[in-house]
Amino acid sequence: MATVQPIVNSHLSELDEDVFHHFGFTTKSFDFKEKFGDVKFVCVCGSSGRIHNFAISMAKLAGLALPVENIAGSHARFVLYKVDHILFADHGMGIPSALIMLHEVTKLLHYAGCKDVLFIRLGTSGGLGVKPGTIVLSDRCVNTKLEPYNELCILGKPVRRQTIVDLNTVNELKKLSENLSLECSVVVGGTIAANDFYEEQGRLDGSICTFSKEEKLAFLQSAYEHGIRNMEMEGTAITSHCYLTGHRAILVCVTAVNRLEGDQITISTDEFTLFAQRPGQLVGEYLKRNNGIIVR
């Protein structure tokens, strides 16, 4: 399991009805154990459209009829789909948005009685020393200080939560990738999760920039030498929150740019769409082989 003694919020037992505001339902909307009790995997990504497409692809692979039902309410912030033993949700952009999703999905799993669920983030990222279109399997996730923590401020006090990646699954995915005919390289390396797309990632093209090109390159080169191979904006939230709540987490992200060569994403829209599908190709095969779906 991810952690020996997962944290459970004791205040939840005092609620007559728990409102999942960002998913548009409550604990009285349906029987959570009946509806979600068999969940073994949760797949998440930033885009609602991309996670919907991935859910559709897994439903087709399972031989299920379409469309895939969005379980979330009509005015919900996030979407939620279920195909056999897999939940699919979007998390928006950045750590704050991802944490909202994580709180509500891990509460859902708690009410459903699900334990040791594997969370898989399928995303896009900026690469470090790898060409665009490369899949990076994260062997660790750090903040921009290259520390393996997600940092929060709770009741005015700083809190650091350790990030933990499920290395067994990372190694399984790497071995699996070597036996598939993927049209890209798959590398294992560290991931930086930043609080911003521009300044915290050392970009020179934001509306504010207080550092030189030389300082930027020194930072990125140092990160590369420490084994970092990509940068995104949610990983520390996912890998720390899942660990604390008794679940496992991995990050599977494709790169859209090599940050050692430039800041802006210059690949075409068609290329970006193609690259963004690559994590799903690898993860989909993994889920099929590990009983995430029931092939009919």
From Swiss-Prot:
Pathway membership, UniProt: Pyrimidine metabolism; UMP biosynthesis via salvage pathway; uracil from uridine (phosphorylase route): step 1/1
A Pfam family assignment: PNP_UDP_1
Catalytic reactions of this protein: uridine + phosphate = alpha-D-ribose 1-phosphate + uracil
GO cellular component: cytosol
Record: residues binding uridine: 125-126, 201-203
EC number(s) given by UniProt: 2.4.2.3
GO molecular function, one term: uridine phosphorylase activity
Source taxon at top rank: Eukaryota
Gene Ontology BP annotations: nucleotide catabolic process; UMP salvage; uridine catabolic process
Keywords carried by this UniProt record: Glycosyltransferase, Transferase
Residues that, per the record, bind phosphate: 46, 77, 121-124
Enzyme class: transferase
InterPro entries according to UniProt: Nucleoside_phosphorylase_d, Nucleoside_phosphorylase_sf, Uridine_phosphorylase_euk
Subunit and interaction comment: Homodimer.
UniProt family annotation: Belongs to the PNP/UDP phosphorylase family.
Purpose of the protein: Catalyzes the reversible phosphorylytic cleavage of uridine and deoxyuridine to uracil and ribose- or deoxyribose-1-phosphate. The produced molecules are then utilized as carbon and energy sources or in the rescue of pyrimidine bases for nucleotide synthesis.
Protein name: Uridine phosphorylase A
Protein source organism: Schistosoma mansoni
Gene, per the UniProt record: UPPA
